[in-house]
Amino acid sequence: MFRGASAINLDTKGRIAIPKRYREPLRAEYNGQLVITVDFQSSCLLLYPLDEWSKIEAKLLLLSDTRASERAMKRLLLGYAHECELDGNGRLLLPPPLRQYANLEKHAMLVGQLNKFELWDEAAWQQQIEQSRETIRSEEFASNERLADFSL
């Protein structure tokens, strides 16, 4: 399970170094194999261990190719999907189209989301945090039935 937010940098070749605390679990449980794709709702990337990505692909397989919205989602998620493996130094190479989609240049945030990571441009992450705070303070959040019984 992945949690926490880590500030990371892209090198001149477009590689990121996965924080050390995640490297061994990724290698031990997933052989260091990941799939990187885009988030169709936000300007960030999603990094899934290959086994977790296989579950997503199984769900995508059930979607229609004739319904425009389902086809659009499949196009984005599968079209951008890039399989990769941690190198000996715990780095991943981000292909240029993925870097462009998320506006990644130098400073980024790797954010654990239990079964996956989100990879954000650092400035975009800060904006997202502010938007999330506003959402939490909104009436819509307060009236969400699924969150009514959620407590910390």
From Swiss-Prot:
Alphabetized SUPFAM superfamilies for the sequence: AbrB/MazE/MraZ-like
GO CC terms on record? cytoplasm; nucleoid
The alphabetical list of record keywords is: Cytoplasm, DNA-binding, Repeat, Transcription, Transcription regulation
Which GO terms are recorded in the biological process aspect for this UniProt protein? negative regulation of DNA-templated transcription initiation
Task: Tell me if Iron-sulfur is a UniProt keyword of this record.
Answer: no
Q: Give the chief site where it resides.
A: cytoplasm
Ranges for domain SpoVT-AbrB come to 5-52, 81-124
- Pfam families (alphabetical): MraZ
Q: Where in the cell is it found?
A: Cytoplasm, Nucleoid
Signal peptide span: none
**GO molecular function term, any single one:** DNA-binding transcription factor activity
**Which family is it part of?**
Belongs to the MraZ family.
According to the record's subunit comment, the protein's assembly and interactions are:
Forms oligomers.
Q: Which HAMAP family match?
A: MraZ
Protein's name according to its UniProt entry: Transcriptional regulator MraZ
Gene from which this protein is expressed: mraZ
